[in-house]
Amino acid sequence: MIIQRVVLDSRPGKNGNPVAENFRVEEVSLPDTINEGQVRVRTLYLSVDPYMRCKMNEETGADYLAPWQLAQVADGGGLGVIEESKHQKLAKGDFVTSFYWPWQTKAILDGNGLEKVDPQLVDGHLSYFLGAIGMPGLTSLIGVQEKGHVSAGSNQTMVVSGAAGACGSLAGQIGHLLGCSRVVGICGTHEKCLFLTSELGFDAAVNYKTGNVAEQLREACPDGVDVYFDNVGGDISNAVISQMNQNSHIILCGQISQYNKDVPYPPPLPPAVEAIQKERNITRERFMVLNYKDRFEPGILQLSQWFKEGKLKIKETVANGLENMGVAFQSMMTGGNIGKQIVRISEDSSP
């Protein structure tokens, strides 16, 4: 059986911007038979995410991430349908997902590494399992709960950077749902700002490309900032931290502005900003959702309930075809997406 796959063809360099040409599509042969415990799957959707930029380097700089190897298939969040199974708990026609799904049209996988999903949780929108009802949703929910210390009735102001992206667009809504009295998003286009305030219920939005971020934040957050969901790092985060209140909290979700630079993760703050953090007793801890696996099942059910009740709005940017994985990744890294960037590999979900 001949299938297509995407391999890493070249590295952008630790300080380079990734381009679509760093990836290559090739045809390979897939065995016709599977072994006990294995399943053959057809890929329906693949995810591209900022953390993958680290995997393009020879060393990721993160102890929980292994680098992609040159000329080897890339992997990440994926979802597919089982075409054949020799695994006792998985059957033909089941929908399954994995955090380590190969970028292939079809694959033979170890069934023990797959998670069966229920289409009813997403009203049939299977790609949502790679976004709002999946890892980005869990990251946003558990991050706000564990590191944001949000409590209803506390009159807290929350700021979200990268607010129109996969995690940011969810984190702001979740902040409201858990009790924040004011939620402000930071993003890079007028269209995204409008999306945040008119569709997602953010109280205000700051466009970092059209004005002074610090001044816009002072206007949008007259009572200062109590919770900061940080997706970007860099100058934007420095501006936010400078306006945070005593005993406030930073949820360190990502640092996309720093991923193309040869710096440690999380990167250290400039001395003046670090002094503010210490003086005001602001918590800033690296958040790893994979450390909270016992919270995944109740978290997915909560996210699904909010979605079905219309309280959690979900937005996707969808590219089509395995050949566009590199294009979608490059676009996502430069802010071309609103909501979760997804790549549809096959439209046929039948087994």
UniProtKB/Swiss-Prot annotation:
Keyword Lipid metabolism carried by entry: yes
A GO term, aspect molecular function: 15-oxoprostaglandin 13-oxidase [NAD(P)+] activity
Cysteine-cysteine disulfides: none
Chain sites annotated for binding NADP(+): 165-168, 192, 208, 231, 253-259, 287-289, 337
Lineage top rank: taxon: Eukaryota
Subcellular location: Cytoplasm
Main location group: cytoplasm
Pfam families: ADH_N_2, ADH_zinc_N
GO process terms (BP): prostaglandin metabolic process
Any one annotated GO CC term: cytoplasm
Family matches, as InterPro entries: ADH-like_C (IPR013149), ADH_N_2 (IPR041694), GroES-like_sf (IPR011032), MDR_fam (IPR045010), NAD(P)-bd_dom_sf (IPR036291), PTGR2 (IPR037399)
Keywords: Cytoplasm, Lipid metabolism, NADP, Oxidoreductase
Catalyses which reaction(s): 13,14-dihydro-15-oxo-prostaglandin E2 + NAD(+) = 15-oxoprostaglandin E2 + NADH + H(+); 13,14-dihydro-15-oxo-prostaglandin E2 + NADP(+) = 15-oxoprostaglandin E2 + NADPH + H(+); 13,14-dihydro-15-oxo-PGF2alpha + NADP(+) = 15-oxoprostaglandin F2alpha + NADPH + H(+); 13,14-dihydro-15-oxo-prostaglandin E1 + NADP(+) = 15-oxoprostaglandin E1 + NADPH + H(+)
Enzyme class per UniProt: oxidoreductase
CDD domains documented for this protein: PTGR2
Enzyme Commission number(s) from the entry: 1.3.1.48
SUPFAM superfamilies: GroES-like, NAD(P)-binding Rossmann-fold domains
Coiled coil: none
Binding site for substrate: 99-100, 288-290
Family: Belongs to the NADP-dependent oxidoreductase L4BD family.
Subunit structure, interactors included: Monomer.
Function per UniProt: Functions as 15-oxo-prostaglandin 13-reductase and acts on 15-keto-PGE1, 15-keto-PGE2, 15-keto-PGE1-alpha and 15-keto-PGE2-alpha with highest activity towards 15-keto-PGE2. Overexpression represses transcriptional activity of PPARG and inhibits adipocyte differentiation.
Designated name of the protein: Prostaglandin reductase 2
Organism: Rattus norvegicus (Rat)
Gene: Ptgr2
